[in-house]
């Protein structure tokens, strides 16, 4: 449930309409063997995902599952990842960093992850504000709660935050809720604070600088994914190249035409076309349509005529759908 709700909330926070969202799921589980407890983990996860999809009217249109995440005595942690997609105009996309001081910050959503009607109502209110141009920034609350969201929204531009003393800020998970920096005050949402220009985050009587929080946050994985290299006193060698320009006659070179047929399940046709063009050829991508018998017949005729015009046929690989043309 939390995975579905979280993914939808993230794309809603970005400015999309939840009613236009589709999902795809990625699952990783240990080898099930003949053990009921192992079978129960993916079964429970998928039942929860289905309940959330029905509650939010969001269909999963594809996905990938793996039930072989075991090597010797090591098991992968039970995992279900939800990806949400929806169309939205580029100019209407909302980013998550606080934009300016003096703006009110509101919370939209329900504390209960499975209160789908309350979530949808809150998301509709929020989306209407997005359409009206009143949302400056937004963050979909995840496992770190509201406190994490406010902290990371402050990192982008160094804009501070002061909490509303009447608001109950959460440090625990609050999947589905959206923190939004608005350009004006409104009714119908919880006011949790205001953006500030002092470079600090203030909760009640506690104040911490954004710089200190950022340093602590980035230091967690610095040893795993270092962002800085070791300093060295060695002089950096200087490289130079001297060459003479000369005029060469224009020589026309024939470019072989390469036919790249795209079957159901084929992928990497664009990579193949780039490789052909980099080698001096002319790529011609032709999609083999098979929705109807007439489509197949026309595709055969098209490919036949294209073959007659080409010097090469390049068949790209495929590992999805029907694994064509070798499936």
Language-model segments: what does each one mean?
Residues 15, 102, 180:
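Residue-level signal for inorganic ion chemistry
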Residues 106, 179-181, 314-316:
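Structural motif
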Residues 3-16, 49, 53, 115-128, ...:
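Structured alpha-helical segments in the cores of large, soluble enzyme domains
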Residues 2-69:
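A glycine-rich phosphate/pyrophosphate-binding beta-strand-loop-alpha-helix module
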Residues 255, 259-280, 285:
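Glycine-rich phosphate/diphosphate-binding loop of Rossmann-like nucleotide-binding domains
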Residues 275-278, 282-327:
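Flexible gly/pro-rich beta->alpha loop and the following alpha-helix that scaffold active-site loops
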Residues 72, 270, 324-326:
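Short glycine-/acidic-enriched loop or helix-start segments at secondary-structure transitions
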Residues 1, 37, 42-44, 59-174, ...:
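Intein/HINT protein-splicing elements and their conserved insertion hotspots or analogous self-processing inserts
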């Amino acid at each position: 449930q939390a995975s579905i709700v979280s993914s939808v909330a993230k794309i809603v926070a970005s400015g999309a309409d939840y009613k236009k969202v589709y999902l795809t799921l990625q699952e990783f589980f240990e080898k099930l063997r003949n053990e009921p407890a192992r079978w129960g983990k993916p079964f429970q996860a998928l039942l929860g995902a289905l309940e959330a999809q029905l509650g939010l009217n969001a269909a999963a249109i594809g996905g990938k599952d793996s039930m072989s995440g075991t090597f010797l005595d090591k098991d992968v942690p039970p995992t279900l990842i939800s990806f949400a997609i929806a169309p939205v105009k580029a100019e209407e996309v909302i980013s998550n960093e606080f934009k300016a001081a003096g703006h009110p910050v509101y919370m939209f959503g329900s504390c209960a992850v499975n209160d789908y009607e309350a979530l949808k109502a809150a998301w509709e209110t929020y989306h209407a504000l997005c359409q009206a141009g009143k949302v400056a920034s937004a963050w979909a609350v995840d496992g770190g709660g509201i406190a994490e969201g406010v902290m990371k929204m402050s990192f982008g531009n160094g804009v501070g935050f002061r909490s509303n003393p009447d608001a109950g800020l959460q440090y625990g998970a609050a999947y589905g809720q959206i923190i939004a920096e608005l350009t004006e005050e409104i009714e119908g949402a919880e006011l949790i604070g205001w953006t500030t220009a002092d470079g600090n985050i203030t909760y009640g009587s506690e104040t911490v600088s954004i710089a200190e929080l950022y340093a602590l946050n980035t230091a967690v994985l610095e040893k795993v994914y270092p962002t800085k290299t070791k300093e060295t006193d060695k002089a950096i060698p200087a490289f130079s190249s001297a060459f003479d320009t000369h005029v060469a006659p224009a020589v026309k070179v024939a470019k072989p035409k390469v036919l790249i047929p795209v079957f159901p399940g084929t992928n990497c046709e664009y990579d193949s076309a780039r490789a052909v063009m980099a080698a001096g050829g002319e790529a011609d991508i032709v999609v083999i349509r098979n929705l109807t018998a007439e489509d197949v017949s026309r595709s055969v005729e098209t490919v036949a005529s294209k073959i007659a015009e080409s010097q090469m046929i390049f068949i790209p690989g495929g590992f999805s759908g029907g694994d064509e043309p070798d499936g």
